[in-house]
Structure formats: C-alpha cells, structure tokens
C-alpha cells in the first residue's frame, strides 16, 4: 500500500450483492493508492465491516419495513431506497464534511452507485464532487437509455420470423431479447432511466468495471454522449483477491470437492444473487445436469425457487442420484471456484460480474440470461466474442444436457476454449502496467486527487 495521501473518499453502494462487491473492491484499490475510505451503507444488506478493518463504515436508516426487505421486485426496492435515504445521507455527509473541516482533512469526492438518483443535487448543495459508479457493461449502460424510444417503436406481437432480427439501436440484442427487457420493465422504469441519464451527465465523472478490450466502441461513444470523464478501470477482482463482502455465506466444502475432480471436467451452475425460478425449471435443470453425465457444482440459493425454501421440490431419490455425480450447495466462493483447474464451463445468468469473472479465468459459458443487462451480456458472450453457448431462454433438460456435452466433450467446445483463452489474455494485459485499464485507473487517481 502507498503512504496515505491525506485524502478521503466517501463511497455509497446500492445494497445489492452485485453492487456491493465491486464497490468494496474499488475501495480496496483506492485505499492501496493512499486514500482513506468511508463507506456509507443502509441497514438492509449491510456489508460486513469487520472484514474490512481499514475502512470506516457508517450505517444509515433506510426506512424499509420487514416486508419490503423481503421483496423480490428489485426496481420497487431501489425506488423505496431512493425515497427513504435522501435525508439520512444528507445528514451523514454534512457531519462528515464538518468533521473533516475541524480535523483539517480533505474529502476528495463522493463515489456512489449510479442507481442513487438523489445524490447529485445533494453533493452539489454541499460543494462536494461526485462520481457515478456503474456495475453494468458500458454498452448496456449507454444503450439502455433508448429503451423508451424502442418501446414506442416496437410492433407487438413479434412474428416468428422477426424473433432473431437484430435491434439496430441496441446491438447485439435480438428483437426477442428486447421484448423480454421491455416486458419486465415499465414506463415508470423509463422515467427512472431518464433520471439516471440526467444525473450522469451532471456528475464529475463515470467509473466502470470494464476495459477497452471488452467495450471499446461503447467507451468512445459514451465519452461523446455523456461529456464527462469516463474511467474504465478493468474488472475489479483482478486487482485484489476475492472480496469477503458477500451477503451470503459460501459453502467452503466446494473446493476440496473440486480438488477430487479431473481437470476441466466440471460444469459450474449459478444464476446469481437475485434471479428466481419455479419448481418446474428447477427440475429441468436437475434432469439436464443428471442426463449430461458430467460432474457438476450447482448453486441453488436459498429462496431462489418460488414457493419453496431450497430444493424441496426435488424428490429424495433424485437428490441421491444427483449427489453421485455432482454437488449442490446454497452458495459458493465463485471467484475461487472459477479459478479452479477442475472447472470446464459455467452455466450462468450472465450478470456482468459473473460474465467478467468467467472471462478473466478463461472459463467458457453456457448462457441462461433472465432479465435486463443479462440479455445483452449473453449476446456478447455467444454472438460477438463467441466464448459460450446460448440456451436461447429454453430451460429444458434436453437443451441443457446438449449444451453441456457440446461445451465439455465436443470439438465445438475446444474452439470456444481457445477463443476465451485469447480473450482472457487480452483482458489480463489491460490491468497490467501500460494496459488500458491500468492507465485509466491511474487517470482516475490523478483526477480525484486534484479536487
């Protein structure tokens, strides 16, 4: 770690697994460059402060009822948090600035998740520089602002012959992907996106956990669109080992189990921290894994199967059969798993964090996106980078079995592994000295040091 530079940065993540982890990783990066770190966080999904003793954590009241904390409607949750947290955050920032003034310390800036829409005017009123931190792929963040226009232009229902047509204003999405995004979102969601766009353009800068090698065209176009400095500092976890900021407790028995498997023989299955499925879909995945006759490590998150606690829908005799070839856990140390020599493929929902982690470890993917940016990420994996196989939304045992066999056993899988190895090397070079992400990070450090 570099010597303290006397500057403090305040970070404010959204309280979701896919937002907290990258923000804590950013905190580690900035701390290693000499910045003191304060993390403001909600009571809901509070990060584990004891895991990061070098940071200062300040908890604010979020006003969520017990019922609201259990909602699976992410957009509703974010709306409620934005309504409830403005006043507590204002008071928290006011106290931090007053304390810094008394102690003759400089607070450089506020870095908050772009999903917090009240922080721009708040920071401006306190004369505090604000940067927006984004956990999406750059191309999705840039293009998703055209969704209101596409909603007006889309002629429904789609004809069968149109399903695979490209969406020219949102490449490389297909029309069937766009339809799923629009069906899951609402006109109110369009309004929220408009506010994010407005606040982004008013910010002092935008930080992405991506790099030119993954987002080159969108990066240059975004600089023109937003007219603010943009820093693509690379995959967050490539700067430091896995963060211990998970909201779930990983099953550490995964690693010794993987140690007993052959190289590149195991299919790892996880649909992330938010996606839910029904009992029929759970059974189709189970049968697909069983029929593939390949070893598997399957994460079934508690509460991820609608109507049940965990895997109660799978008959006991079938669980015994599954356990002969694979291992089912409630959560896994994903970065550690993907690094393991035994992993041959990743059946994923294609959240951006999971997608980038898979690329960085050279693990080819089977794409099963469910919502929002996952649909775009999956198209990049299967259609642009060609480092994965797309299930095209079909959660069917035969499709899953076939995809696993194609990836692990057939020559198609060998070609995919070669391509993802090349992509891994390109992204890896970006975070090393003189790489694009390394230079962007250095530019960010210099920029926030100048405030």
UniProtKB/Swiss-Prot annotation:
UDP-alpha-D-glucose binds at residues 273, 332-334, 349-357, 371-374. It comes from the Eukaryota. Keywords: Glycosyltransferase, Transferase. InterPro entries: UDP_glucos_trans. The keyword Heme does not apply. Its EC number is 2.4.1.-. It holds the Pfam family UDPGT. One of its GO terms (molecular function) is nicotinate-N-glucosyltransferase activity. GO terms for cellular component: cytosol. It is an enzyme of class 2 (transferase). The keyword Transferase applies. CDD domains: GT1_Gtf-like. Belongs to the UDP-glycosyltransferase family. PANTHER family: GLUCOSYL/GLUCURONOSYL TRANSFERASES, UDP-GLYCOSYLTRANSFERASE 76C3-RELATED. This is UDP-glycosyltransferase 76C4. The lineage of its organism: Eukaryota, Viridiplantae, Streptophyta, Embryophyta, Tracheophyta.
């Amino acid at each position: 770690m570099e010597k303290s530079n006397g500057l403090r940065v305040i970070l404010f993540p959204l309280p979701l697994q896919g937002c907290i982890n990258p923000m804590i990783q950013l905190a580690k990066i900035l701390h290693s460059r000499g910045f003191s770190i304060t993390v403001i966080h909600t009571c809901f999904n509070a990060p584990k402060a004891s895991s990061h003793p070098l940071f200062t954590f300040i908890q604010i009241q979020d006003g969520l009822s017990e019922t609201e904390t259990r909602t699976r409607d992410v957009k509703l949750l974010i709306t409620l948090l934005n309504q409830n947290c403005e006043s507590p955050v204002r008071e928290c920032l006011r106290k931090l600035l007053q304390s810094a003034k008394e102690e003759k310390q400089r607070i450089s800036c506020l870095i908050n998740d772009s999903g917090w829409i009240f922080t721009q005017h708040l920071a401006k009123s306190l004369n505090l520089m604000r940067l927006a931190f984004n956990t999406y792929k750059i191309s999705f963040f840039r293009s998703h602002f055209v969704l209101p226009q596409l909603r007006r232009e889309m002629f429904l229902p789609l004809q069968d012959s149109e399903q695979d047509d490209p969406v020219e204003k949102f490449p490389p999405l297909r029309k069937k992907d766009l339809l799923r995004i629009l069906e899951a979102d609402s006109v109110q969601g369009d309004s929220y996106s408009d506010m994010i766009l407005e606040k982004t353009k008013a910010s002092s800068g935008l930080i992405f956990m991506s790099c030119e090698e993954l987002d080159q065209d969108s990066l240059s176009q975004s600089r023109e669109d937003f007219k603010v400095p943009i820093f693509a500092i690379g995959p967050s976890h490539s700067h430091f080992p896995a963060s211990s900021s998970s909201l779930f407790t990983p099953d550490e028995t995964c690693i010794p189990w993987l140690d007993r498997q052959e190289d590149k023989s195991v299919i790892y299955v996880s649909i992330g921290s938010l996606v839910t499925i029904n009992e029929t879909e759970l059974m189709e995945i189970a049968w697909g894994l069983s029929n593939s006759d390949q070893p598997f490590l399957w994460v079934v998150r508690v509460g991820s199967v609608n109507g049940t606690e965990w895997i109660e829908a799978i008959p006991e005799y079938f669980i015994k059969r599954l356990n002969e070839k694979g291992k089912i856990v409630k959560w896994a140390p994903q970065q550690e798993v993907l690094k393991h020599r035994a992993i041959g493929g990743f059946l994923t929902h294609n959240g951006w964090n999971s997608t980038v982690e898979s690329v960085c470890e050279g693990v080819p993917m089977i794409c099963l996106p469910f919502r929002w940016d996952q649909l775009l990420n999956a198209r990049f994996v299967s259609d642009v980078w060609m480092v994965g196989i797309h299930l095209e939304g079909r959660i069917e045992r035969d499709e899953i079995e076939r995809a696993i066999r194609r990836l692990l056993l057939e020559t198609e899988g060998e070609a995919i592994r070669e391509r993802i190895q090349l992509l891994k090397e390109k992204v890896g070079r970006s975070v090393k000295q003189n790489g694009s992400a390394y230079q962007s990070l250095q530019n960010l450090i210099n920029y926030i040091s100048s405030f």
